[in-house]
C-alpha cells in the first residue's frame, strides 16, 4: 500500500494541546489512535504527537504536514495529544501523569522555539469541547494541573 502524502503546512501559527478522552487504565498510543481515526474515515492519525501515560512521546502525522485535530486551524497548526483525560465514568478529568506533563512541557518548549511566533492553544479555545480536560494557560504559567470547566 502506498504511503499517504499530506499537504505540507505553509506556516505554523499555533500549537494545540488535546486529550485522547480515554480512561487512565487505557494506555494507548499512536497505533491505537491511528486505528480509531481511520475507522472514522480519516487517512491517518490526526495528531502530530501523542504523549503516552509513561511520558513517551510518539510521532503521529508527519510534523510538517497539515494535521486533522482542530477544525479551521489544521492548515497552520500542530496537534499534540495527551493520552487520558476522562475518569472511569466518562467525565473529563485532568488525570494525566507527572511524566506526561513533564514530556508535554519539554515538547512545547521545543516546538514554540522551533516555530517562532506560534502560540499555545487548547482545543477548547476554538471548539465547544472540554478537551484537553485541563486549564492549559494556568498549567503553562503556574504549573498547576486543574481540570477544565470548559466544554
Curated annotation (Swiss-Prot):
Q: Name one GO molecular function term.
A: zinc ion binding
Q: Which Gene3D superfamilies match?
A: Peptidoglycan recognition protein-like (3.40.80.10)
- Entry keywords, A to Z: Antimicrobial, Bacteriolytic enzyme, Cytolysis, Host cell lysis by virus, Host cytoplasm, Hydrolase, Late protein, Metal-binding, Viral release from host cell, Zinc
Query: Is Transcription a UniProt keyword of this protein?
Result: no
Q: Where along this sequence does the record place binding of Zn(2+)?
A: 18, 123, 131
| Subcellular compartments | Host cytoplasm
Q: Name one GO cellular component term.
A: host cell cytoplasm
Top enzyme class, one word, equals hydrolase
**Residues at the site labelled Essential for amidase activity and zinc hydrate coordination:** 47
Q: How is the cofactor bound?
A: Zn(2+) is required for amidase activity.
- Domain named N-acetylmuramoyl-L-alanine amidase: which ranges? 11-132
**Cofactors required:** Zn(2+)
Q: Which family does it belong to?
A: Belongs to the N-acetylmuramoyl-L-alanine amidase 2 family.
Q: Summarize the protein's role.
A: Plays an important role in the switch between viral transcription and genome replication. Once produced in sufficient amount, interacts with and inhibits the viral RNA polymerase that becomes unable to produce additional late transcripts. This lysozyme-polymerase complex in turn plays an active role in viral genome replication and packaging. Endolysin with amidase activity that degrades host peptidoglycans and participates with the holin and spanin proteins in the sequential events which lead to the programmed host cell lysis releasing the mature viral particles. Once the holin has permeabilized the host cell membrane, the endolysin can reach the periplasm and breaking down the peptidoglycan layer.
Q: What is this protein called?
A: Endolysin
- Species, as recorded: Enterobacteria phage T3
What gene is it encoded by? 3.5
Amino acid at each position: 500500500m502506498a504511503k499517504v502524502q499530506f499537504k505540507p503546512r505553509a506556516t505554523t501559527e499555533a500549537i494545540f494541546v488535546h486529550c485522547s478522552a480515554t480512561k487512565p487504565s487505557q494506555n494507548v498510543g499512536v497505533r491505537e489512535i491511528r486505528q480509531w481515526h481511520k475507522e472514522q474515515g480519516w487517512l491517518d492519525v490526526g495528531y502530530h504527537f501523542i504523549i503516552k501515560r509513561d511520558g513517551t512521546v510518539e510521532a503521529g502525522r508527519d510534523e510538517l504536514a497539515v494535521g486533522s485535530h482542530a477544525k479551521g486551524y489544521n492548515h497552520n497548526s500542530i496537534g499534540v495529544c495527551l493520552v487520558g483525560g476522562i475518569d472511569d465514568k466518562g467525565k473529563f478529568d485532568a488525570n494525566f501523569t507527572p511524566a506526561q506533563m513533564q514530556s508535554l512541557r519539554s515538547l512545547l518548549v521545543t516546538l514554540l522555539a522551533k516555530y517562532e511566533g506560534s502560540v499555545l492553544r487548547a482545543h477548547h479555545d476554538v471548539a465547544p469541547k472540554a478537551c484537553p480536560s485541563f486549564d492549559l494557560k494556568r498549567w503553562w504559567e503556574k504549573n498547576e494541573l486543574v481540570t477544565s470547566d470548559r466544554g
